[in-house]
Amino acid sequence: DAGLSAGEVTRALGGYDRAIGFGDNGAVGIGGITLGGGVGFLHRRFGLTLDNVLAVEVVTAAGDVVYADDHSNADLFWAVRGGGGNFGVVTRIKYALQPLSTVVGGMMMLRATPARLASFVQAAVDAPDELCGIIAVLPAPPMPNVPPELYGQPLIFALMAYAGTEDDAARALAPLRGVGGVVADGIRPLRYAEIFEHGGPPPMPAVSVRSFYMDEFDDVAAGTTMHLLEESSAPMHAVQFRVLGGAVARVARDETAFVHRDRRIMGVAVAAFSDVHQAPEHDAWTDDVTWSLRQG
């Protein structure tokens, strides 16, 4: 059922020691995640969410219910994997399940400097395919595990997951931990479903989000990122980086409608706020981040 949430499906599959790599938010519906791509905590190991789709059921604009896979309505099957909901309403999705019950994961927090941010992102790029995560830099909000004296200071929040053994995870994570400035390190063995239960500040009623792609992230890009953070007046704002590559890049660029196979980093600018009348101001900031950092 395409209306289920990522968290619901992940918890159900965990009872069978199986997993599907969805995005990074358990509250989001699996339909949107799947049709748009699906970058989360397993994509470098098992591919994007859409790479694990075996078949879909689609209601077309004419009201017809159509089954599509590699052999039946193959053009439609190609288009919905990466083309979003532009080709009909996807009501059911058949996935390949991956044998996975636990990961080594959790949140790391580090004091942010341009050099440290650049080194951390590069270490994630160089890491084994089993390691995925979200690397976000933002002014630290009041939340658990953040010392009060760091509220408002720029921190790197890295929510990471390693799909492998604890010993292998320790080796893979060593370069990330080695960049220094670690404030908190909550990475530990856990059930895969637990990675979606990470805490955070309460949501706000309005949000501006823009995404972009990069192939390199050096000290200059990191410095630009840190400067841009100072330019936002939103109560909550961040720039996030998700490393691609691995299994994502091993699928041919024309095999699905997802066209960013060869990109190395996906960036996201986020501004969350309460006053909807301020949307143009915060949209301008997320646009500025996008145009300042995007490559190609």
Each language-model region and where it sits:
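Soluble FAD-dependent oxygen oxidases
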Residues: 1-296
